[in-house]
Amino acid sequence: GVASISSNFNQGTIDVTGLDLDLAIEGGALPNAGGFFEVTDPATGELFYTRAGSYETNIAGAVVTRDRFRYQLQGQDGALLLGAQEGENLLARRVEEDGKVNLLVNKDGLDTLRTAGQVKLVNFSAPQYLRRVGNGYFSNGLAGQNIAGMLDNPLPTIGSNGKIRQYALELSNVDLTNEFASMITHQRSFQAGSRVVTTSDMILSEAVNLKR
């Protein structure tokens, strides 16, 4: 049987998408591979951690995951709000390597650059203890728990944290070609072992019949 299932947090390939709220974590110290985005379930307040960086804004301007969960991306001061304010026309969003988010807006005919928040990265001293909850999300335990040893460096490029790459996503770190080759090798080994067992059974059966 399978003794255990462990998560591999080594960095995957970075793929440029051109979408301004596609964010990848690049660099950082292994085995943490640069940290995790922190997201929250707005219905329950529960926190989760993920390397997936595909986001968009909802009608309220909050940055949320593009999947069906719609978890809110956390900044240094809570959920990030990157929508235009009253009277503004949003022209562009810029996420710096250190996580600072600047918005280029037009108000009353003037283009203005304003800081809108800071993307939060979270890292752990023992990420192998993060609890997998599915769909690329992980939990650090129940409220008040710290089962994976959260570190006090919540900023990109600080400590073991990586930097933020805007307009890009991190792809899976699984090499499908190697995994399929490994699976076929193991399958053939299993089949060979099964044939050995079958042959041994046949020889034993013949020996028993001869004795009779």
Kindly label every feature range from the protein language model.
Residues 1-77, 81-84, 88-212:
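Amphipathic alpha-helical polymerization modules
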